[in-house]
Amino acid sequence: MEPLKGLILSGGAGTRLRPITHTSAKQLVPVANKPVLFYGIEALVDAGVKEIGIIIAPETGDEIRAAAGDGSQFGAEITYIVQDKPAGLAHAVLTAEDFIGRSPFVMYLGDNLLRDGLRNLVATFTDHEPDTLILLTPVDDPQSYGVAELDGEKIVRLIEKPKDPPSNLALVGVYLFTSLIFDAARSLEPSWRGELEITEAIDKLIDDGRTVRSEVVRGWWKDTGQLADMLEANRLVLEELVTSIEGDVDEASKVEGRLVLGPGAKLERSVVRGPAVIGAGAHVEDAYIGPYTSIGDGVHVRRSEVENSIVLSGSVVEDLGTRMEASLLGKEVKLTRSEGMPKTLQLLVGDRSEIKLV
């Protein structure tokens, strides 16, 4: 089998993470201070896939190009492919046909995280050479997913959000294809959603007698499309954190557990209970940083408590008077409590934001 190429889909609108994704691609929202997209690129490179195409949308493509560059920082060669409209995964495959050519390839949804990466999956594909290999994971609510019906490791059919699921094994968003997928995708008509569905293209391969096999996820998998999933992914990644202190910790501060403290960062009269990561140039003063917290580059936290949260670069959290927990703050957000009476709330809140006051 000739070398595999990689195809990462990063064109989605990220509606479930608004308002963060009004101004940023959802695949660039960080987990443990690293954009989710970068985990996918690194997983492909680790599996030996170094020629990678990234599907981008016109609205967020420039930001993704600026972040990932030409791929050299990952040891990869990246080509950017514009999908003019979100017309389905099979449409994205067809959009990338010129890049893929006749090569087999890995298709990876750019907001996924896999603990154990792709190395074993790619090895299975190259060793056994099925026409398609799909990654599956057990879920508690298969009615909410695309689900596979299996005969051993062979997939008999795929069913989208079944009322009576034939299994609890859901599609993860990682697929390995040969070039046969292009003709299958071309044969499709748009679904009721107006999209070309990848599940229908795979079913076409099954109907044509092609070999479509499955592998079950080893370790954990997370789709980071919603706040709760993003925070859980952050927790899972931080669970495996290795301590690295490059910044300054004064004598009045206390660090318990594992911490990554970036260069130029400062802890002053503060307590950090890890696992936690604090980015370059961040300043934590008279504050408490609790477990499973990611503080971005240049963030200032003063006289406040933050736990189980993600705070993006350049933000300020100051004088809150209560603990902030299970939260995601975007870039350059300023969150403060003013002194004086009367005790009131003064808010400037963008469209489709969510604020919970306790």
What are these regions (language model features)?
Residues M1-I8, R16-H22, V29-P30, K34-L109, ...:
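Conserved N-terminal catalytic core of the sugar/cofactor nucleotidyltransferase
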Residues G12, E59, S179-L180, A228:
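Alpha-helix/helix-capping structural signal
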